[in-house]
A protein has these predicted regions:
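Gly/Ala-rich beta-loop-alpha elbow adjacent to hydrolase catalytic centers
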Residues: 106-110, 114
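Acidic catalytic loop of the alpha/beta-hydrolase fold
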Residues: 221-225, 251
Length: 271
């Protein structure tokens, strides 16, 4: 009997291992597959709804793909690294989009993954939109994240605390239920993992070989690290454009002003 149980345990272990390997990133799609493809990568702690207004505005003219980044709500896969997320999206583009797409956009953590994609595959898209993206590593922030979330992670599941966080992020009010639901669904381990990855990301040397036309956007009211990072990205990509958006905070363009973001995409592609 002991031998039988041991054999079953080995088989179950092998099955579970195979299931774990087969888990893939999830994607939300808008528009017809025959149209030019635009991929938009949401910010850390958010999800596909980061770009819901943008997707609704563009879906009649483009095929919009909204990946749910690993470690986030509705994802079945733990967050590992920015580099691994980038690799997985490249593999998806190879398998489903013929190896390249019209445009990729990304906000904050999504912007870092976008820059990593461009570093790993220089010609994967014709256009790129980098919004509110940090590329100046901070070891101090990195080491503060784990103890900070160790003490307050449990509060995230309280609506009053989540509402305070939400208000500080300057996200429009009608997205609160999305935010609260999805923040509660993120594990402590995943939240610490992607926040720490975000705090340490820096540009790869290979980004300079990128052939995409890159457009960089930051809000006028971003913190100094984001503002300096935007200049770093612009300097690494001399043919890129950099625009500071008056009166806007971190990530507000795509989250709160989806129609404006969509219009900028149309203008970029039409040039």
């Amino acid at each position: 009997m002991l031998q039988k149980h041991a054999s079953c345990d080995i088989i179950n272990s092998m099955i579970n291992k195979n299931l774990q390997v087969s888990v893939k990133m999830k994607y939300i799609e808008y528009g017809k597959h025959c149209l030019d493809t635009i991929i938009l990568l949401h910010g850390g702690g958010l999800s596909w709804w980061n770009y819901e207004d943008v997707a609704n505005a563009l879906q009649n003219d483009y095929h919009i793909i909204l990946p749910i980044l690993n470690g986030h709500a509705e994802s079945d896969k733990a967050f590992t690294t920015i580099e691994n997320n980038a690799k997985e999206i490249i593999e998806y583009i190879d398998a489903h989009c013929g190896g390249s797409v019209l445009m990729i956009g990304g906000l904050s953590l999504g912007g870092q993954i976008l820059l990593e994609i461009l570093s790993q595959r220089k010609d994967i898209c014709q256009y790129a939109v980098v919004e509110s993206t940090l590329v100046r590593p901070s070891k101090l922030t990195y080491y503060m994240i784990k103890p900070a979330f160790g003490s307050c992670y449990g509060l995230i599941k309280h609506k009053w605390f989540s509402a305070l966080q939400f208000k500080s992020l300057k996200i429009k009010a009608n997205l609160f239920e999305h935010y609260f639901r999805d923040t509660c669904a993120i594990s402590k381990k995943d939240m610490i993992a992607f926040l720490q990855a975000n705090s340490l990301y820096s540009l790869k040397e290979s980004i300079k070989e990128c052939t995409a036309k890159v457009h960089i956007y930051i809000g006028e009211k971003e913190n100094s690290s984001i503002r300096k990072s935007a200049v770093d990205i612009h300097n690494a990509l001399p043919k890129s454009t950099l625009q500071v958006l008056p009166k806007l905070y971190h990530g507000e363009l795509s989250i709160n002003h989806g129609n404006d973001y969509a219009q900028k995409i149309r203008e970029i592609i039409s040039i």
